[in-house]
């Protein structure tokens, strides 16, 4: 089937932090349109594809994206008009070649990705198919286990917690709907616990709380308390996941990590994590070490990778070259997938496929600067990834993804699968 792209256009819109981002629209020959908004991260890996910002301090404090919009309207549009909307790999290859840089810094990953996503949406809309079915085919049926970021620290919060995300993982349920309900009930229980203890319960970028607690371990204890008080069983129905984002507390010059006010070597930090894993129902740890500390990842995965999902985010930046190295070294047993780290839909799908073929799990993830766009909800089901990270149970740019997954689960009906603990196929539990 050949359906021509007849128009490609972009505009500057706002993300959930009130910063500009790129929205693209792709129009097909019969008038069908696909639209997409790209997200933006706060803690970014240094190997990520680069978004372009205007750096004009008089507009949006330098964060405008008019240059990226111009790149879509004046460079990308002429190249894609006349192309087949159903040839996503060729569209994305054209975008990559048009840019010509390793990290998409000429046209901007924000310009390229907005168009790549919009093309996929337009093609799905033309066929009258839901996006997950267009991208994933008839076998797209697995609803993801949500990793819900309910306590924020690190670069996502102005508090004294080093680790960036403390998540609840409702994996012990039979449907996505039940898992979501458990997450919401725990979230509200947690709010009550924090409020009664005198903590501020305002929420951060991803909808989680950012209390000043005495240590990272105290944050885990508070989560366990919330799970129990909400009427659920920690370690059976609901588990804990951590995103350490360790690059943010690593001193490159000294080669040490700063955790709980102390200097720690990779080896000492490893011991610290092992103690936490022994004491609490921690099922997943993301970026426990800095993005170039490969040896520590390899050793840690060797030690605890049979019982804990070790996830590479900044380590891999959704890049198949870095992922290949990780697979070869057995550096992790899981990868975090972010569309805007790599910059096209095809490259994202390639990374998921490579991980899954090598018995690694893939977690489809949002960014801290999100929008009402629900592309990643469909992507999680399209790839049967089994996991999604899309924030807490508040802020509508987060709940938009959960609501889309509820719709998809309902639409799939009896075919829908929520694998729960079985989604953790890279570990033996």
Swiss-Prot record:
**Main location, first listed in the record:** cytoplasm
Q: Name one GO cellular component term.
A: extracellular region
* GO process annotations (BP): glycolytic process
- Keyword terms, alphabetized: Cytoplasm, Glycolysis, Lyase, Magnesium, Metal-binding, Secreted
* Requisite cofactors: Mg(2+)
Where (2R)-2-phosphoglycerate binds, per the record, is at 164, 338, 367-368, 389
Q: Name one Pfam family in it.
A: Enolase_N
Q: What is its EC number?
A: 4.2.1.11
Q: Which pathway does the protein contribute to?
A: Carbohydrate degradation; glycolysis; pyruvate from D-glyceraldehyde 3-phosphate: step 4/5
Q: Which residues form the active site?
A: 206, 338
- Record GO terms (molecular function): magnesium ion binding; phosphopyruvate hydratase activity
Checking SUPFAM superfamilies in the record gives: Enolase C-terminal domain-like, Enolase N-terminal domain-like
What SMART domains does this protein's entry cite? Enolase_C, Enolase_N
Name the record gives this protein: Enolase
Task: State the organism's lineage.
Answer: Bacteria, Thermotogati, Thermotogota, Thermotogae, Thermotogales
């Amino acid at each position: 089937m050949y359906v021509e792209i007849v128009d490609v256009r972009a505009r500057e819109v706002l993300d959930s932090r009130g910063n500009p981002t790129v929205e693209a629209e792709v129009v097909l020959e019969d008038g069908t349109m696909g639209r997409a908004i790209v997200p933006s991260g706060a803690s970014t890996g240094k190997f990520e594809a680069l978004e372009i910002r205007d750096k004009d301090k008089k507009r949006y404090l330098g964060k405008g994206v008019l240059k990226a919009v111009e790149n879509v309207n004046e460079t990308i549009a002429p190249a894609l008009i006349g192309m087949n909307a159903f040839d996503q790999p060729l569209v994305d290859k054209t975008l990559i070649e048009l840019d010509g840089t390793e990290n998409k810094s000429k046209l901007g990953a924000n310009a390229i990705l907005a168009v790549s996503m919009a093309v996929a949406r337009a093609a799905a809309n033309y066929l009258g198919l839901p996006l997950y079915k267009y991208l994933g085919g008839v076998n797209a049926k697995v609803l993801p286990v949500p990793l819900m970021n309910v306590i924020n620290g690190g670069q996502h919060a102005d508090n004294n917690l080093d680790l960036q995300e403390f998540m609840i993982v409702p994996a012990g349920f039979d449907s996505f709907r039940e898992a979501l309900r458990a997450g919401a009930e725990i979230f509200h229980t947690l709010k009550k616990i924090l409020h009664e203890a005198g903590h501020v319960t305002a929420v951060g970028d991803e909808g989680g709380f950012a209390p000043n607690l005495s240590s990272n371990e105290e944050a885990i204890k508070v989560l366990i308390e919330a799970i129990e008080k909400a009427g659920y069983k920690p370690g059976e129905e609901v588990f804990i996941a951590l995103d350490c984002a360790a690059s943010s507390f690593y001193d490159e010059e000294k080669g040490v990590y700063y955790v709980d006010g102390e200097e720690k070597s990779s080896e000492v930090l490893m011991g610290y994590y092992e103690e936490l894993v022994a004491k609490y129902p921690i099922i997943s740890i993301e970026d426990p070490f800095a993005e170039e500390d490969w040896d520590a990842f390899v050793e840690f995965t060797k030690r605890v990778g049979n019982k804990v999902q070790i996830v590479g985010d900044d380590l891999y930046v959704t890049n198949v070259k870095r992922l290949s190295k990780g697979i070869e070294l057995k550096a992790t047993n899981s990868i975090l997938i972010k569309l805007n780290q790599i910059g096209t839909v095809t490259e994202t799908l390639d990374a998921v496929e490579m991980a899954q073929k090598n018995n690694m799990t893939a977690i489809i993830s949002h960014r801290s600067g999100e929008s009402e766009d629900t592309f990643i909800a469909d992507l999680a089901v399209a790839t049967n990834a089994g996991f999604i990270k899309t924030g807490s149970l508040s802020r509508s740019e987060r709940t938009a993804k959960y609501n889309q997954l509820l719709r998809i689960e309902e639409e799939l009906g009896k075919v829908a699968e929520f694998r729960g603990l079985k989604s953790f196929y890279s570990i033996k539990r």
